[in-house]
Amino acid sequence: FDEDGVRTRVVNADHTAMLDVKIPQSSAEVFDFNEPHPVEIGILIGDIKDMTKSLVVKDALTIEYNTGDPTWLTLSANGVQKKVRCKNISLIKRLKVPATDHKWSMNLPWKQVKAFLGSCAKDPLFEILVNVQMVSLNAKSDDETLTLDLPSSEIDLHIEGESLITHITPAHFISLMSTTSAKTVFSAKGSAASVVETEWTESGLKLKGWIAPRT
């Protein structure tokens, strides 16, 4: 927490995908921060998941933290209040942004990418093939071949080089982008066999994600 808003960073269990979420002060209905310095707390996602997973778009979630009583984070929604015990921040490992190498960048429509990923969600990997003409997402199995081609003119594609390939696990990509609405266009950056970085805005939240390649 700081005067600009709230920020959190989470990573999945096998450390193959990481998400950075920023909630700007302007995106909150009410925001009150009276500390002279930023305040950090540590919580387990599982401790708050049950409180948040039932919320819909019009619901309001109130988050309260009192430095005078630093043991608890209080969540309130729809008349229900939950107090979550905070963890010792000094014992929590800091999540560092992975090294990235950006040789290509593009703006992708989530609706089409989601349709592709949903069709190969159980596959171990899919291919991102980027060249000057297009990006091609490809998944293969013994029974089928799945392809999504998006021309460079439609996705604002920029590339250094002729052709670059990266392999990603579909389930990790779907999980990382799970908060994304169908109409959202997200930016993606990467290189050959490198971390793929994504960035988008959703309902006032600023989100940035990183997905490790399959090697």
What do the PLM-derived regions correspond to, one by one?
Residues 3-122, 129-215:
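DNA polymerase sliding clamps and clamp-related checkpoint/processivity subunits
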